Amino acid sequence: MLTTQVTVVVATRNRRPGLCRTLEYLAALPERPPIVVVDNGSTDGTADAVREKFPQVELVLLRRNLGAHARNYGVHRARTRYVALSDDDSWWEPGALTRAVRVLEDHPRLGLVAGTTLVGEEDDPDPLNAVLAASPLTRGALPGPRVLGFLGCAAVARRDAFLAAGGYSRLLRIGGEEELLAYDLAALGWPISYRPDVVVHHWPSAARDPRRRRAQELRNHVLIGWLRRPLAHALAETGWLAAAARRDRDPVTSRALAEALLNLPRALSRRRLLPPSVEADIQLLEHSNAA
């Protein structure tokens, strides 16, 4: 079966009940994919619960929280050609992995399939679905709209492409980390295509702090500018965040600015401009989204 070629990788930290629910759904999938859980240093008995209730799951234990970078450890452990990336509060719809693998098999230069995400008990469409579906980028021979973004819980990637691009950045940890990976895949010639028939269900954990997540996203947007974008863009984004923090005196923007500046030396040491064609695509998307 095609679906034996995909491993589901889940990163988690201190969300034992939600993770167990997710693993119940994943274990019941008709595709029966191998599952790797990477535990980001949980202290709530997560590892013991996985061992007891899901002995078939491969468990990777990290000593501390590495954020989204932890997924890289799971991808390295995978022995399949493709990897399906999941959160501890999301799961794939039956048949979704079969469809994703078939698309990747039929398009050998495709690096990643971005799926569609349905949120909560009501299956509300995530707003990103419409954004990806309306991408203005030229599609070419791809099986769906060509995009430069995806949700981390709704992606099926070619394992070799994921690893060649460096996976998820350790510097960014969490909060918009998919953006940098999408850019780096494109820079290596591995496009991403959106497929509305590859469906994920996401029930966001109540333990998520929306203000903290917003600060992380703002911080990482600035850092990505310094990591990959032209100098003028990086300066403009940093200036915007500094002005917002000074004007609003909001703890969210202030924290984002402080963390961005703290991590700026590390970002500069990793700075690598994107190919002109990828930068042009990013600018096209930015102009389209601003319209």
What residue ranges belong to the model's regions?
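Short, acidic, metal-binding catalytic loop of nucleotide-sugar glycosyltransferases
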Residues: E24-P33
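A conserved acidic beta->alpha catalytic loop
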Residues: Y25, D39-D48, S90-E93
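Glycine-rich, basic loop-to-helix element that forms the pyrophosphate-binding segment
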Residues: L61-A78, R99
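Short aromatic/hydrophobic "clamp" motif used to bind/position activated sugar donors
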Residues: V83
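Conserved donor NDP-sugar-binding/catalytic core segment of glycosyltransferases
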Residues: P94-P127
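Short, flexible, basic/aromatic active-site loop/helix in glycosyltransferases
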Residues: G115, A130-V147
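A short, conserved alpha-helix in the catalytic core of glycosyltransferases
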Residues: G149-A157, A161-G166, L171-V199
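Non-catalytic, C-terminal membrane-associated alpha-helical segments of glycosyltransferases
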Residues: Q216-E217, P230-A291
